[in-house]
């Protein structure tokens, strides 16, 4: 098995880490940053940008720049969460043929899993550049409160990106691994994870290398994006009051506001007020308009108070489910960029009645934990046992539209549970198994994971046939269900890929597309490198001709200048062979110039220098070869 990387696939930012010499190391990307914006953009020329470069051009290309796609993954288009996101997103969200949410960009539809896979490819490349080897195996994190559809879609994204996803691990559990790996004492901890788009709270018991999740809860549609939106709404209304102009329909202005809101939110974590100054935000008949609004920390906290209040319910439920009170918790670990906000920290203190622990990097700790889990799976990290739980109850629909639970929430996974059911009518030849996930008592109020039929039941009075339904949840939290007629031995099973989601055929197609796109990216990179190399050479030779051109004859000089012109023309085109050929021609043409340069340089360094011993260039007798380099270096300097 090769190296296993750990990826925190975040709503706002993503991060990748790997085990190096027994320790987890966070890997910086090409731009030198340890986190990468989870943003994908599609340019007019057909180029695909991922990360910081995509974020930088978002203002001028907002309709084709996709962000926060994690909030859409594994969700139905008609869900209230997707409809809300659709109302505030500059890019187009539409309904896929299977009822899922999809994104439409430049005339093509993309599933959220496909967009996520593009971010994963960037993280994979970041790791490959650092490690100098091809990576195929990964551990990817998801919010603990993600349902089966969202987990499956995340796994699909990994597959499309060319990754073998060894494990899907919950973000708070990963953070607990990173926090507790070197801890020797037994303790009960709460991991409070508020990120860009999701909120999780997990209660764990740590001791002797065992990380046991006692309960988990959360909200998969609550995070920094919602806080930003409250600030944006405030700025829009203030600007309308001040200037009488509503800028909600101006996508470019809204993108500038989004960036300003995010920046202001961050600044207000350390200062009491900030100025939001956006010149030329819009214009009317009287001329350009500028936005200049002062935002205080108190005003911002008032704007987001309702969101902060929503953090308490899941925490109380998680404590209750774990059978603990706040005073039983030894440490509260803060995870996710939003936990830097002073009001959030204050809320955590109010809920748990203690100061939260701030000793981990909230942006990196999840990726670090994922890398540790990779180390556990690869055998590099010993004596660590992770016992995670399923966040939501699982069951089937029974007579009267009731949900009968087979596996209760917070059951340790992997797990398997069977229960015997029967028919509801005489001579019923088949039963339809409607698989559900959720906590409500009626089937219609819960999420449908899938349906399948067990057919060929022999005629019998109702209540006589015995049908055994078995639920199996693997270590990734992904569900498999089977139904067996104990009388005939007939069995029918499905691996739940949700009532929608991508089919295996669609995934394979997207994998092939991603591979071909990878080849395109490689060719583009080669072209850019060839252009840069040829351009740099042309510049260097041009500079030398100005300095040493009088040392070669006019015909030779004209030949070199002609070769430079050919290089300049070639780099304007897209033919890599033409660029390389022009560069080779310039290399050959500039040989005479190079000889003239070296001849002049060697003459300049021939005479003895003051204070040097006898011999050329001040080299004393018996000196080592490397000393020649030192002497020449000193002389040139």
UniProtKB/Swiss-Prot annotation:
Query: GO terms for molecular function, please?
Result: ATP binding; ATP-dependent protein folding chaperone; unfolded protein binding
> Which residues lie within the region annotated Disordered?
597-637
Q: Which residues carry this modification: Phosphothreonine?
A: 198
Entry protein name: Chaperone protein DnaK
Conditions for induction: By stress conditions e.g. heat shock.
Q: Where does this protein have compositionally biased stretches of type Gly residues?
A: 608-621
List compositional bias (Acidic residues) regions by residue number.
Answer: 627-637
Sorted alphabetically, the keyword list is: ATP-binding, Chaperone, Nucleotide-binding, Phosphoprotein, Stress response
- Family of the protein in this entry: Belongs to the heat shock protein 70 family.
Q: Would you say which domain of life the source belongs to?
A: Bacteria
Described function: Acts as a chaperone.
- HAMAP family named in the record: DnaK
Q: Which residues cross the membrane?
A: none
């Amino acid at each position: 098995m090769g190296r296993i990387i750990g990826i925190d696939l975040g709503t706002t930012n993503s991060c990748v880490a790997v085990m190096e010499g027994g320790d987890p190391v966070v890997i910086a990307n090409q731009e030198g940053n340890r986190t990468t914006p989870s943003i994908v953009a599609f340019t007019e020329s057909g180029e695909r940008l991922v990360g910081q470069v995509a974020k930088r051009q978002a203002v001028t290309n907002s309709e084709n720049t996709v962000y926060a796609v994690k909030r859409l993954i594994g969700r139905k288009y008609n869900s209230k969460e997707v409809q809300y996101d659709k109302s505030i997103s500059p890019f187009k969200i539409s309904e896929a043929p299977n009822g899922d949410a999809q994104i439409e960009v430049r005339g093509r539809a993309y599933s959220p899993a496909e967009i996520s896979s593009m971010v994963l490819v960037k993280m994979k490349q970041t790791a490959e550049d650092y490690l100098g080897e091809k990576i195929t195996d990964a551990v990817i994190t998801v919010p603990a409160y993600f349902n089966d559809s969202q987990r499956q879609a995340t796994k699909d994204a990994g597959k499309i990106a060319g990754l073998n996803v060894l494990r899907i691990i919950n973000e708070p559990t990963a953070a607990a691994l990173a926090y507790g790996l070197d801890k020797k004492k037994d303790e009960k901890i709460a991991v409070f994870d508020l990120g860009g788009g999701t909120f999780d709270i997990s209660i764990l018991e740590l001791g002797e290398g065992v990380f046991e999740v006692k309960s988990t809860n959360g909200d998969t549609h609550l995070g920094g994006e919602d806080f930003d939106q409250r600030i944006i709404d405030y700025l829009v209304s203030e600007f309308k009051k001040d200037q009488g102009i509503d800028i909600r329909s101006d996508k470019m202005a809204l993108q500038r506001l989004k960036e300003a809101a995010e920046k202001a939110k961050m600044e207000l974590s350390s200062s009491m007020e900030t100025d939001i100054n956006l010149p030329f935000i819009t214009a009317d008949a009287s001329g350009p308009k500028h936005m200049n609004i002062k935002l205080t920390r108190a005003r911002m906290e008032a704007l987001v108070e309702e969101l902060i209040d929503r953090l308490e319910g899941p925490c109380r439920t998680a404590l209750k489910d774990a059978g603990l009170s706040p005073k039983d918790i030894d440490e509260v670990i803060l995870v996710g960029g939003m936990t830097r906000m002073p009001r959030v920290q204050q809320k955590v203190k109010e809920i748990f009645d203690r100061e939260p622990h701030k000793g981990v990097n909230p942006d990196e700790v999840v990726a670090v934990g994922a890398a540790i889990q990779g180390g556990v799976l690869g055998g590099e990290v010993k004596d660590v046992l992770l016992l995670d739980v399923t966040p939501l109850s699982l069951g089937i629909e029974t007579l009267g539209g009731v949900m009968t639970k087979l596996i209760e929430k917070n059951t340790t996974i992997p797990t398997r549970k069977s229960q015997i059911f029967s028919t509801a009518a005489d001579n019923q030849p088949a039963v339809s198994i409607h698989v559900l996930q959720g906590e409500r008592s009626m089937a219609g109020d819960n999420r449908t994971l899938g349906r399948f039929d067990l057919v060929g039941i022999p005629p019998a009075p109702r209540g006589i046939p015995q049908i055994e339904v078995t639920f199996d949840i693997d270590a990734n939290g992904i569900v498999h269900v089977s139904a067996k007629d104990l009388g005939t031995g007939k069995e029918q099973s499905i691996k739940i890929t949700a009532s929608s989601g991508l089919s295996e055929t669609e995934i394979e197609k997207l994998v092939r597309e991603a591979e071909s796109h990878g080849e395109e990216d490689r060719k583009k990179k080669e072209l850019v490198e060839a252009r840069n190399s040829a351009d740099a050479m042309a510049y260097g030779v041009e500079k030398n001709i100005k300095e040493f051109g009088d040392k070669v004859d006019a015909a030779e000089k004209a030949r070199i200048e002609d070769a430079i012109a050919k290089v300049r023309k070639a780099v304007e085109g897209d033919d890599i062979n033409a660029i390389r050929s022009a560069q080779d021609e310039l290399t050959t043409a500039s040989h005479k110039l190079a000889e003239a340069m070296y001849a002049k340089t060697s003459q300049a360094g021939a005479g003895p220098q003051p204070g040097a011993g006898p011999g050329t260039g001040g080299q004393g007798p018996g000196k080592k070869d490397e000393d020649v380099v030192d002497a020449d270096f000193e002389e040139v300097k």
